[in-house]
Amino acid sequence: MSDTLISMDYRFVDILNANQLEVGDLIGLGIVGIVKIISIAPMKDGFLLVIENEFNEEEDVEILDDEKFEFFILE
């Protein structure tokens, strides 16, 4: 039986506004890098995101309504 290493790369797809984000999206988030959105909750001036980084660590991040984010897919 042979072992196969599968390499997956992120591919930039689009720029999304904060109100276009969905649970499960992979977005670029500043110096943190590419993260997965776990949950989204509306706030007065934006949204509260729970994100997961490449080490499976979760973190809360507040974003504003007018922010834009790079959207990625795995291929």
Enumerate the language-model features and the residues they cover:
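Intrinsically disordered, low-complexity, charged/polar segments
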Residues: 2-8, 58-75
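Basic/aromatic-rich interaction segments and small domains that mediate binding to polyanionic partners
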Residues: 34-62
